[in-house]
Each structure stands twice: as structure tokens, then as C-alpha cells.
Amino acid sequence: MEKGECILYPCYFNAALSRAEGRRVPRNIAAKGPNANDVERALRRLGIACQAEEHHHPAHWARHEGRIIATYTGKKEALIKKVARAIEVRK
């Protein structure tokens, strides 16, 4: 991973998961069952370059939900919140 790249997993935005299970946003802006395509679409809508990969979150090795590598120079937590607000799949 190069400088300025952030790896995003769909579990970061999943309202069904607890924080201990990998959710990184508050439930009120989390989505119901997001997948890598939803995250990628949200990033493209925000104008952020990204690339999808067929990898899984280390804690969720049995779920092959994919991951997204986004080119972003700011803080990862700020990017995660921007993406969470842009994802269309809601509760």
C-alpha cells in the first residue's frame, strides 16, 4: 500500500455489526448490508479514485465481501464518515 491510499472494507459501514465486530461509523449513518460495490459507487460519487479487490477483512475471513483501495490524502476516519453518508443502501 502506497502513501495516500486507504483500505476500506464493507464491514466498516454495516449497521448489523457492533463496533467490536468491525463497524467504524455510528449506527445512524451506517448502512444495512453494504457490499464492496456500494462502497465503490459512493467513492466515485464523491470524486475519489478507487480500485476494488477480491480480499476479505482479516477478522471476517469466511466472508469474501471484497475491499476497496481509495486514493485519499486526508485522515482515514474522515474518509470513512464521508463514504458512510454517501452510501445509498440504508436501513
Swiss-Prot record:
Alphabetic keyword roster: Cytoplasm, Ribonucleoprotein, RNA-binding, Signal recognition particle
Subunit structure: Part of the signal recognition particle protein translocation system, which is composed of SRP and FtsY. Archaeal SRP consists of a 7S RNA molecule of 300 nucleotides and two protein subunits: SRP54 and SRP19.
Matching HAMAP family: SRP19
Subcellular location, record wording: Cytoplasm
Molecular-function annotations in GO: 7S RNA binding
Keyword Oxidoreductase tagged: no
Protein name as annotated: Signal recognition particle 19 kDa protein
Any single GO CC term annotated in Swiss-Prot or TrEMBL for this entry: signal recognition particle
Pfam families: SRP19
Physiological role: Involved in targeting and insertion of nascent membrane proteins into the cytoplasmic membrane. Binds directly to 7S RNA and mediates binding of the 54 kDa subunit of the SRP.
Similarity-based family: Belongs to the SRP19 family.
Species of provenance: Methanoregula boonei (strain DSM 21154 / JCM 14090 / 6A8)
Top-level lineage group: Archaea
PANTHER family: SIGNAL RECOGNITION PARTICLE 19 KD PROTEIN (PTHR17453), SIGNAL RECOGNITION PARTICLE 19 KDA PROTEIN (PTHR17453:SF0)
Record-linked InterPro entries: Signal_recog_particle_SRP19 (IPR002778), SRP19-like_sf (IPR036521), SRP19_arc-type (IPR022938)
Lineage: Archaea, Methanobacteriati, Methanobacteriota, Stenosarchaea group, Methanomicrobia
GO-annotated biological processes: SRP-dependent cotranslational protein targeting to membrane, signal sequence recognition
